[in-house]
């Protein structure tokens, strides 16, 4: 199993006394880099110090007046070789995934020694780096607020009663063993387009064994089949809703097998998912709010699926990447502060 490691470059603005590395550097850029790095929930975070090389966050170091920006190429190469030597003792340079929150001079001779890496701030000036990091950190706080709020609402699960569900609104799904923001992790957000159809929509997911009426059911079935490398996955993809498609494809499908998969999907959903609901009467407002909630959660680096999350068996890259049982409305416009305030007042 590979590890996720983040490397943050040091800065000139420091405290004037010996302390832990994560506290020594006091510039806004370093502080936001560190907050962002921690939000990613990596396995390890290190500081790239111009004087001390590779430094752990809790390592106590003295302040110093040294930067790679004033070093010659030969000095930078020597420094980089020392960092690589240290790094190779605490990480697998060929298998681990590295994220650089560091300038060009700090990373240029490290990158050739590493196979897997990301540079999210590449090409950005200091001002734009701060803007990027502030947005990331702010979105994580919004996502945390959403999780705290939705985790506080009355939780429903199968079997559920119509009287506990509004006719029009939005549902928020949670999945067993999935955690985020000190609570249950949100794994799906959904609504309906037809008038008074929220109850019906939830029944299509939880009860009615017809994957062509529920993309959520179809995605759960895809995971079962893909995990088993079952060739029936190709037939599972066929949609028999339209009359012409039913006439064309029915003879291709083993309906006894399909029924067994539908039953398996029902059991998995009923046993593993719970949800909360809240009313939104206006269709346009429902759809807009659904989209913004999805985007807010998909943009949050703290909302990571567990290592054994069932969704990792999906053939859909967007599901595996986002950690959500969704492929639409990901990474778009998140909720504003005003949106969150209004949401809590519904």
Across the structure, where does each feature detected by a protein language model lie?
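GIY-YIG nuclease catalytic motif and its immediate N-terminal context
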Residues: 1, 138-264, 269-346
